[in-house]
Amino acid sequence: MSRFFYGSGSDSDSSSDEEELLTDREEEEKSEEESSEEEEETSEEESSDDEGETGANRFLRDASESEESEDEEKVTVVKSAKDKRLEELEGIIKLIENAEKINDWAVISSEFDKLNRQVVKVTQSGPVPRIYVKAVADLEDFVNETITKQKSAKKMNASNSRGFNAVKQRIKKNNKEYATHIEKYRSDKDGYMEGKEEEAKPAIVAPRLTKVERVVEAPAAATSTDDGFATVGRGGKTLQYTPESILKHLRVIVESRGKKNTDRLEQIKTMEKLLEVAQTPYQRIRVYLTLLSTRFDISSTSSANYMSVDQWKLAEKELAALLSVLETNRDHVVTEGAEEWEDDEKQPQVKPGETLHIPGSIVSHVERLDDELTRSLQHIDPHTAEYIDRLSDEKQLYTNLVRVQAYIEGLVEAEKSDMRQDSLNRVVMRRLEHIYFKPSQVVTILEEGTWKALPSELDSKVTPRGNAGDVTGLVQTLCNYLFTYSDGIIRARAMLCQIYFLALHDQYYRSRDLMLMSHLTENISNFDVNTQILFNRTLVQIGLCAFRAGLIYEAQNTLSEVCGSGRQKELLAQGIILQRYSTVSPEQERLERQRQLPFHMHINLELLECIYLTSSMFLEVPLMAQTSSSPELKRRIISKTFRRMLDYNERQVFTGPAENTRDGVIMSAKFLAAGDWKKAAEMLNSIKIWDLMPQPDKIKEMLSQQIQEEGLRTYLFTYAPFYDSLSISTLSNMFELSEKKIAAIISRMISHEELAAALDQVNDAIVFRKGVELSRLQSQVVTLADKSMNLLEANEKTLEQRTQGMANAFQRDQGAGARGGRGPGRGGQARGGPRLPGGQQGRRPGGQQFSGGALGGAIKA
């Protein structure tokens, strides 16, 4: 009884051991109750049938008795679950043997997987079956024979070759677990197979009143917790976490990655227990690497798109602990491409002077930690305290980045290789991306806190500890290192980060020269989307820097590429514009959302639009005044966005006071165009968004000065035709500028041939040249002539379309036979038709004929 109870086990791999024992116990009780009930019912039915057999039923008695006798002859064989599983095991082994005969490795590979899954179920209730040991031993011999036959291996097709390689890789790992059984089998095959199977000792199960009602007596050597309770694994076996079993547990966890119904939280608890019993540095490093990967797997399979805060902080602490172990034990190196240790029974021994290479990637872990923090910031409301708390975790992440950089520097110094150099470049790039957009004061605090948190003996050769206070030198050092040792996208991104940093710190000319010398403007379309976003951010920052420096033309010219499109949010990755009839697929939209920048990296779009419109106003208003007074000049538009907003505002019947930043700039432009520069300056300075810029008083003073200068230019363009001469002192009093400044502005206008005048320095006056500028009447005449020419050209095009280019379209006096139209003699003698009186053959009915209008009359005359 106990054997069947213990061996019933779990028929599905996904059910837990606790539920197996519970359900088995319940099923036995239910089966006993049901059997007793069925016996009672059958006895009652038999008695009722015997009493009720009357009439026709008496004549059917012989037939029923014969059927009962036939049923008694049939013997029903009841097999236990263990026997059924052994039969399934034998069937799989038979298929493998048949496939070996025809050399079908695809079938062998698939059946070998089934065999291993089936043997797990069988071994839950007993020892390893001898037929399984025989099968895997013979299969290993068959693999070795196939390897020796090189020619036959070359003749395999693709599916056969894949199956053979899969079996060859798995058979050695699999047979290590059954090495003792296989040795016994190979030493005496017949004697081994004739021996009897050992019975498994049943576990003693005691009922409990909890959901899991069982207590398994653990061995005395096992470490018990919770008042005598111990962790029990599959088949009721007590799980023992010892230093010798660490690699086996890790192997099971690694092989279960990617499979369904895998409890990763339980795996994490297991690895935390393994950390407690780990003794050697190799064991701790292996556990930390697997533990970090498992924590990151939780976020990839969860419904949330980012890692939870608790899991992230635990992963960050474990990464710091892993780095501490690696810094202490320099003979253990975690590197990509290292060979994996296959023997789980024993651990590798490091001889003095040698280095043990462990497969893994420290850089990938710190990059994943960085990405998870970014995803978390993307999904948190930036206007809450939670965002600020989450942003404070960046300090720990930056500390780990610097620590990983110092560790990889040591590896590169010990052994230079392209792979290690690439890893170092990736870490340096990540570090640069965390500081390039921050002001110097913030970076200084971050650097000082980082070096205080790191061990005192730890230092970096690329960025020494002593240079932490020089932020400009730090950015320059990181960028120069990437310029020297990297290429492609990393070098381009480093260049853009340096340009952004220089522009942020008001070094316009250096940032502009670097942008021009890099030639990134010509090649940016060849880079990935994230680099293009960084390019747009850098371009905008250069424009803002030019505006702060008072370089209005350069600012407007730089910002027009991004702000003129009306898609600032998309181009700067600060939001998604959802269009009604967009053809964007859900996958593209998901990628677009992943590329969005966290809120603390955003550039203020309202401030950006205000600066762009203000710069456009300073250029457009004088240009509009110049073209209105000089219509012979070709009309050109500097900013279509500004013109469109200004035209819309002028079409309004009633305009109220300015309600937002955009309205404030447009109202200021209207005052400036009307010549009232004081109201324009007052309106522009009243915009509150200037307070968000550094040194707002200096910015407002610069804006007032620009309005005075552009107001002077607008006044001269508008009223120059009405003056013979104009005193400079009068202009100085009117615009509150120094006479020297006014003379400089007028000289510049004269040199650029914007103003037909001369500067009389003796009398301090401007002398305008007559005959060059057109009067109002002359301007109107020129405008009328242009419109007449346009009308004439339009009529000529219409004429050619109607007559299809025939020269004799309006020669009516030459008679009916000479009519043009759609062909010679239409409706006349050419087609044999009757000649109509009055030369009216070929005319279309209805009486509506094209006469050419005024142009037709002119041609007929």
Swiss-Prot record:
Matches recorded under Gene3D superfamilies: Winged helix-like DNA-binding domain superfamily/Winged helix DNA-binding domain (1.10.10.10)
Compartment list: Cytoplasm
Alphabetical keyword list: Cytoplasm, Initiation factor, Protein biosynthesis
Sequence intervals crossing the membrane: none
Protein name according to UniProt: Eukaryotic translation initiation factor 3 subunit C
Domain PCI: start-end pairs: 599-773
Entry keyword Protein biosynthesis: yes
Summary of the function given for this chain in its UniProt record: Component of the eukaryotic translation initiation factor 3 (eIF-3) complex, which is involved in protein synthesis of a specialized repertoire of mRNAs and, together with other initiation factors, stimulates binding of mRNA and methionyl-tRNAi to the 40S ribosome. The eIF-3 complex specifically targets and initiates translation of a subset of mRNAs involved in cell proliferation.
GO cellular component annotations of the record: cytoplasmic stress granule; eukaryotic 43S preinitiation complex; eukaryotic 48S preinitiation complex; eukaryotic translation initiation factor 3 complex, eIF3e; eukaryotic translation initiation factor 3 complex, eIF3m; multi-eIF complex
Family the entry assigns: Belongs to the eIF-3 subunit C family.
Alphabetized PROSITE patterns for the sequence: PCI (PS50250)
Acidic residues: compositionally biased ranges: 14-53
